[in-house]
């Protein structure tokens, strides 16, 4: 192998190692057997969420994972491997790939890294069932609104009771 080829591969290992370190999640799949149309559709769905799907040689993946501190991943780098890297949403790759794998049995999820932690297939499936970040924030805001609204109704009820009862209600409230 020429020095130029070795340098190119070393640079690729560095790039992939950096992606593993900096990504919110990296999910490894085996996309063997997908048609060109299916592969294009999968890449399109991932790209809409800002996720990059790269087919990478296992030797490069192995070295990059070791360099990034994820040597435990080396067991899943068998057969053709593609990695979906997301820098923003840790759950989106799991959700999209799981949904696509359910519809296309040829796509096999192998595992990955989510928020710096090694994730096996079961973990990826759990992450896939979580709502998106925006969905979770929406649920949190709904809870805040409910709590504030309930407090406002309680204050209003006390005020109404005080207005109805006059001094007797004030004395009862002070006694409590």
UniProtKB/Swiss-Prot annotation:
It comes from the Bacteria. GO terms for cellular component: ribonucleoprotein complex; ribosome. One of its GO terms (molecular function) is large ribosomal subunit rRNA binding. CDD domains: Ribosomal_L10. Part of the ribosomal stalk of the 50S ribosomal subunit. The N-terminus interacts with L11 and the large rRNA to form the base of the stalk. The C-terminus forms an elongated spine to which L12 dimers bind in a sequential fashion forming a multimeric L10(L12)X complex. Forms part of the ribosomal stalk, playing a central role in the interaction of the ribosome with GTP-bound translation factors. HAMAP family: Ribosomal_uL10 (MF_00362). Belongs to the universal ribosomal protein uL10 family. This is Large ribosomal subunit protein uL10. It comes from Leuconostoc citreum (strain KM20).
